[in-house]
A protein has these predicted regions:
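C-terminal catalytic and target-recognition region of SAM-dependent MTase-like enzymes
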Residues: 30-31, 39-80, 87-185
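Short, charged, surface-exposed loops that flank catalytic or proteolytic processing sites
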Residues: 26-34
Length: 185
């Protein structure tokens, strides 16, 4: 619960301490035991948005499966294989994924020079063009037909010119897991 996968878990430190305390005396063998443990830490007044253990289970799943690491390696691999005018469209199902996607896409959407530079060299121009304005959310009609779509965020970019040569080693490093997406994990 101290990993970045748990960064949006309410009261994650008290929950982690309580898990350690309980495990010192007995193993946590069932999901029901973990739910009870989380319920004992989080006051009833803070449970308006549903079961608080839901985010704990999500954080554990994300960390155990290495989901953010896989995402951070997959996005640059895709970018390196895009042809000019190729599109990268990503659906994110929770805020941590969306943040990683947003930060990755922003690398190619921004001018890569100091703010006071009078002339911007060609290789510092953005190589992605945004196809969505921020993250698109499901419409109310879609949510009525598919309740799971309420958490989905969609972002899309198009490769508007070849990736500059100086970016390729950086993307290759990210794809190999040698360097995380800036601000990602």
């Amino acid at each position: 619960l101290y990993s970045s996968a748990a960064s949006d878990v309410y009261k994650r430190q008290p929950i982690a301490r309580r898990i350690v305390e309980v495990r010192a005396t007995e193993p946590i063998a069932t999901s029901g035991q973990l739910v009870s443990l989380v319920d004992s830490v989080i006051p009833k007044a803070h449970r308006a948005t549903g079961n608080p253990a839901k985010r704990v289970f999500q954080a554990l799943r994300i960390e155990v499966n290495g989901e953010l690491d896989k995402l951070s390696r997959t996005l640059p691999k895709i970018a390196l294989h895009l042809r000019e005018h190729g599109r990268l469209v990503v659906e994110s199902y929770h805020s941590l994924e969306d943040t990683a996607v947003k930060r990755f896409m922003n690398q190619g959407l921004t001018v890569d020079v100091p703010a006071n530079m009078p002339v911007i060299p060609d290789d510092a121009q953005p190589f992605f063009k945004a196809l969505t304005r921020g993250a698109m959310k499901a419409s109310k009609e879609e949510i009525v037909h598919n309740t799971r779509s309420s958490s989905v965020r969609l972002r899309a970019v198009e490769l508007c010119r070849p990736i500059p040569e100086r970016w390729i080693p950086r993307l290759e490093d990210e794809a190999a897991g040698r360097k995380a997406i800036k601000g990602g994990r």
